[in-house]
Amino acid sequence: YRLQSRNWRVSPLVDSPGLTLYVDGSCLGNQNVDASTPASWGLVVVIGDSGLGKGSGELTHEEAGPVVTSPGSPGHIGAEVGSNNTAELSGFAAALRWLLMEGGDGAAMIRADSTYAGNLASGVWKAKANRELVANVQALWDEVSALRPLSWSHVKAHRGHRWNERADHLAARHALGESPVPLTFWKPGQR
C-alpha cells in the first residue's frame, strides 16, 4: 500500500484485480511430519474483492483437497510429507490449476498467509526443501502468468480477514475429514 499525501487515505498500489483467489493450508500435528501426516488446502475464488478483509465481492468457487504424498497417485505433484508448508504450496497449485481451467485472460491475484509458499510459488525464493513440489508449482505459475497478469500478496493469518479465514476453514475441515460449514452459517474464525 502507499499513502496518498493529499488526503491521507490508504490506497492499493494497483487496481483490484477481477479475480482474487485465497489459499490456505492446514496440517494436523505439524511436528515430526511424514507422508501419512494429514494435511489439506483450501481455495476460495472471489470476484470484485476489495482486499480489505470485510468479505466484499462475490464468492464464485470454493474447494478443499488433501496434500497427496504418494507418487503415482492422482493429484500427486511432488509433496513428500504432509505439513503446513506442503499444504500451502498445494493450495497455490490448486489456485493455479483453477485459473488454467477458468481460461480467462484478466488479472488475477492469489492471496495467502504464507510468505514461504507465495515467494516460492512465484519464483522469488529458491527452494531448499520440497523441491519437486516447488518446481511443479512454479511451472504452473509460469504457465498461468504467460496467459494473464498474475500476482500474489500476503494477508495476515487469523486476523478476521473473511476470505482468508474461509480458506483456512475449508483446509482445516478437510484435514479433519469433516464437511465445511455452509457459507451462510459460517462465521470468520470458526474452524
Positions of PLM-derived features:
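Loop-to-helix element that buttresses phosphate recognition and phosphoryl-transfer chemistry
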Residues: 87, 91
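RNase H catalytic domain
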Residues: 26-33, 38, 71-74, 78, ...
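RNase H-like nuclease fold core
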Residues: 1-86, 97-98
